[in-house]
């Protein structure tokens, strides 16, 4: 565990995908006692696929249940609302009740966040200084998150299930067309495993001019990578 300000400790653990997510989490806490230490701040960062963004203006108490039913195609047990004040929006994502309750009992000060939140805030900050629209695509496993900003305004965000390059090409070009982006002046940044990103860039260059590749490791803002004394960040991942 880091004891010096600015130090960073990271541990990756392989898990048995045949076991339930809750049992896997219990095993991790039993095998790694530092997870249960008292911390000044605890962040649980999830990449839960069930998410959406709603404007702050319509996220009111009397409308929440209706929003949840409309947002999630299948019922979710717990809905977490993460404010994104810079975007004047709220990021909603669903969680399993058993995992949520286990974390609440084990780490009562834990704060849930979605991996997409940090990305959106970083892209929003960039777009405030940009003259043209910019689309971002992040490919991990069999999903692709796509977002587009135009001078500080979020134009689009969604997650797609993808199996191959053809799927990625289809969704990227479809969204590009629907948003009426300019193939000469507007930009696309791809983040994926290097071989995927550069192969996809080569194919897309037939249609778009400004295509960039950014390593996934550099996506997250500095405050997501920097560890401070008394802080714990846990990032569960889902294998598909």
Label each region the model flagged.
Residues 1-240:
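Hydrophobic/aromatic-enriched cytosolic interaction surfaces used to assemble or bind macromolecules
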